[in-house]
Amino acid sequence: MTSPALNFITFNQDHSCLAVGTSKGFRIYHTDPFSRIFSSDDGNIAIIEMLFSTSLVALILSPRHLIIQNTKRASTICELTFPSAVLAVRLNRKRLAVVLEEEIYLYDISNMSLLHTIATSPNPSAICALSPSSENCFIAYPLPKPREDPDANRPAHAPPQSTFVAPTSGEVLIFDTLSLKAVNVIEAHRSPLCCICLNNEGTLLATASETGTIIRVFSVPKGKKLYQFRRGTYPSTIYSMSFNLSSTLLCVSSTSDTIHIFRLGAPPGNTTPAGAPIESPASQRQDRWSRARSYDDSESPGASAADSPKNEPAELNGPGAGNNQGGHTRGSGSFSSMLRRSSQIMGRGVAGVMGSYLPQSVTEMWEPLRDFAYIKIPKSAAASGASRTLRDAPGGPLRSVVAMSSSSPQVMVVTSDGGFYVYNIDMEHGGEGYLVKQFSVNHSVLEGDDKSDASGYGS
């Protein structure tokens, strides 16, 4: 029997559940222990969103039609029809946000009354984040751009009388869904936005541009830049970002097969002028697992393309070097690799000292910010049909979704072929996480190191 195509995969707000929309209904799973708790075989589900661990789910079966359903009572609470296709749905205990390509509809979730309609620039990727918090109830989305701008870089092939619409901006608008007022605009990137997310308390915003080499974290609603991380050397499309519930870690997945985990937080006063924590000797020891980082800050709002070199070569132990396909090694033991790591530690130490004397736009070039830990996800050996379905889904491109467990230092990864993977992270030393459990959301249990949760699967 052929498994239904996967259309949509998402974690709920506290990462305790996983919802999967398929061509033949939808399923909901507990993440720890991993077990199926609800399933429905009705409809071709393009989008599904949960409200924490309640029985309320939002479903998109046809492009313009939203259904709010109570799974416990098997009843429909309400149905809404929109003027164009629904690209995303966001929920918290106060608000429901429905994202269309050029509008966002805000509803009071207690009575489903329409509160406000936000006009946006064309946003086909549905870049939008709603805080899970009922107090800091902010929604973030790309700052709308004027539809007609005489200074816009109109393509040469555009018809003379046409209206050129600029691509999504690199600025984020923060909107308070309780007061229904815009509260701030954050200049996050010079390149168009690709992915944004808010933490559980609605106090932190993570952003990534289409370039995908730099991840930034800002305070909300003030918009102060707190952290700047480097994901890698080469451009990559960011698919998913997620804070853990305590907002001390940020997970990022992309087109590469590496999940990056960045550490947030530093002792008071132990920061660089740009707000990035200075590394301790313990974190410097992680160099043996680090890869080269791009020093291209051209997407930074405060930097120009001439500020830094763009062709920084990768380290010899980086991806694609020799026979090391994983890209992360625990040191080759050679004299040259030892010398290189020593030079990196010394160079980064000098960068931290020099940063205190240089302007912010210059110190950002020196910041030795990198992932605290990382994960190598398995490459799918299955046919790419499921992947194509997920990429073509109204929710936008989706190859992998990540979240941190709420009860342990573990990272959960769901891939577009239906694999569900759980990795342990060493919270003291970081480095490479190791696989401890693996299951499938396609009705079969994958081989793995831990079969303890398999009995609950499919029940």
Curated annotation (Swiss-Prot):
Places the protein is found: Preautophagosomal structure membrane; Vacuole membrane; Endosome membrane
Consequence of gene disruption: Does not significantly decrease the growth rate under nutrient-rich conditions.
Q: Which Pfam families match?
A: PROPPIN (PF21032)
Gene Ontology cellular component terms for the protein in this record: endosome membrane; phagophore assembly site membrane; vacuolar membrane
Q: How does it sit in the membrane?
A: Peripheral membrane protein
Compositional bias of type Low complexity: which residue ranges?
A: 265-277
Keywords attached to this entry: Autophagy, Endosome, Membrane, Protein transport, Repeat, Transport, Vacuole, WD repeat
Bias kind Basic and acidic residues: ranges: 285-296
Q: Where is the composition biased (Gly residues)?
A: 319-330
Subunit note: Component of the PI(3,5)P2 regulatory complex. Interacts with ATG2 and ATG9. The ATG2-ATG18 complex is essential for autophagosome formation.
Give the family per the record.
Belongs to the WD repeat PROPPIN family.
> Domain remarks in the entry?
The 377 first amino acids might form a beta-propeller domain involved in specific binding to phosphatidylinositol 3,5-bisphosphate (PIP2), leading to the association of the protein to the membrane. Association to the membrane can also occur through binding to phosphatidylinositol 3-monophosphate (PI3P).
Q: What is this protein called?
A: Autophagy-related protein 18
